[in-house]
Amino acid sequence: MISKNNIYNICFILIFILLAIINKVSSIPENTEWQANHSSDLRIISATVSEDRLMIGLNIRLHDGSYTYWKNPGDSGVEPSIQILPNPEIIQYNVQWPAPIIIKNQYGTNYAYKDDLVIPIELELTNKGNLLNLDLDVEYGVCREICIPVKDRIEFKIINDIENYISHSNKLLKSVLTDIPKYRLDDEKVIRTTKLLNVNGTNVLSIIFSEQVKGVIIDQSDNFQFFDTGNSLEYYEEYQFTFREIYNGREIKGEKVSALIFLENEYFLEDFIIE
């Protein structure tokens, strides 16, 4: 039989643990302070939970009409890098890039962001309940007439326990998650077929669509780099990319490629096999 004193002691310990957890969470600011850089500012947006995933956000605020680049900058520009320094309580993390805009000018075609940008980062933690002091290294370009590379480090805190964030909701971060390109639920395909061409000695991939599209970006290919050669039009029924091998001796026929497709009021990912 448990004595009253033991019950009081157990209750006291539980209350102490609860207060310690509350104190940990309350000691973490909702967002880090803005850090000033060339024509831009940086901060970390605090954690939120979406579909049982713990998310933070890298917030980049661009000044005076400047822009920065997507994970694939396109024909020119500065390829960004976002890295969380190793920590034994982080199993892995995944940077999730919102859909960019397509910029066509005298320098070619580039994929970029303007104004205020939030890049979600999904964290998988060990859930040990500890307060973590983390460092995020970021490199990106800030561009107008010329591009200036920026390199910075942001220090931030997080509780290593997803349950602490279940009831927490950062509206800005949650709204940005809807901007992450996804595959269509109806599984309808917009890419009808592909053709391989040789135009004046240059290898060209031609993509033919089943309906008019506003734009297309080659999102991922393991063995080839693709370069946009399309003119600036309102709609496209066919689009062409030049390409080159990343590894010598690869055959492009049968290569699986992921594309980001823009329609009038939506965008989505679609995989296809080069025929």
Regions found by a protein language model. Give the residues of each.
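Bacterial N-terminal signal peptides
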Residues: C11-A20
